[in-house]
Amino acid sequence: RTDGQGAGAGVSGRNGSIRPWKAVYCERFAIERNWRYGRYCVRVLRGHTEGIMCLAFREKISQLSHPILITGGYDRTVRVWNLQTGETLRVLTGHARGVRCLQFDDCKLITGSMDRTLKIWNWRTGELLRTLEGHTEGIVSLTFKDLILASGSADSSIRVWNCQTGECFPLNGHRDWVNALQLWSGSSSSNSSDSMFLFSASDDFTIRLWDLRHRECLMVFQGHVGPVDRAQTCSWIHESIGRDRGRCC
């Protein structure tokens, strides 16, 4: 067996953890089997008054015994849900147009809107901590790690922010909407933009890799023949999925 193909090989999760591939396969197989035979329950969550454009889910939250779902919609609101009961815990208002992207951790929630702003919230209390302005068109993607936040916009630009100070710098190069962003660090313990990299996916059919320390594009990945909607990194591969139904690795 070669490296990466043996029983000990692992699969990298979104949080950087490594799980044995057999355990991941068994889990996915059980989910597929339960779905096929109707062994599942359905809960419909109602509250938004217009289309829902983004969501994020966390199963384990410190000091909480239930999973949390947060959704954003064209009704300009963000809703925090208790998935165990289906109850709306909080409704966050403040955006002037639809909410297109969001991400949250144990306490902090960041939302991006077509009103061209980012908002940083304490989702547990509902407090609005900061509003970030800089993009000239709506914000359609974001990603953050600790104090580093990157946002992508319909203005074709990326901005990298310090969540604490509100300072930012732009990354220019894409020629159309920036649909997806993914931070990547060479060191799992690094919280500084000095050692962080960023993948971006765009409607211009390309994916770009950026060096945040030098604020420059290191590489342009070309291959999709349509807009690229998603990008995801793992420990040994970078994968993107586009509207051309293609996949590049």
PLM regions: where:
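Loop/turn segments within WD40 beta-propeller blades
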Residues: 56-66, 102-107, 125, 142-147, ...
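Conserved strand-to-loop turn within each blade of WD40 beta-propeller repeats
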Residues: 72-75, 111-115, 123, 136, ...
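Intrinsically disordered, low-complexity acidic/Ser/Thr/Pro-rich linker and tail segments
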Residues: 1-61, 66-79, 87
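WD40/WD-repeat beta-propeller blade N-cap
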Residues: 45-52, 93-99, 106, 125, ...
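Hydrophobic, ordered structural segments
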Residues: 98, 103-111, 116-119, 124-129, ...
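A detector of tandem-repeat and repeat-rich interaction/domain scaffolds
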Residues: 67-71, 78-80, 88-90, 101, ...
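Short coil turn/linker residues within repeat-based beta-strand modules
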Residues: 39, 85-87, 96, 125-127, ...
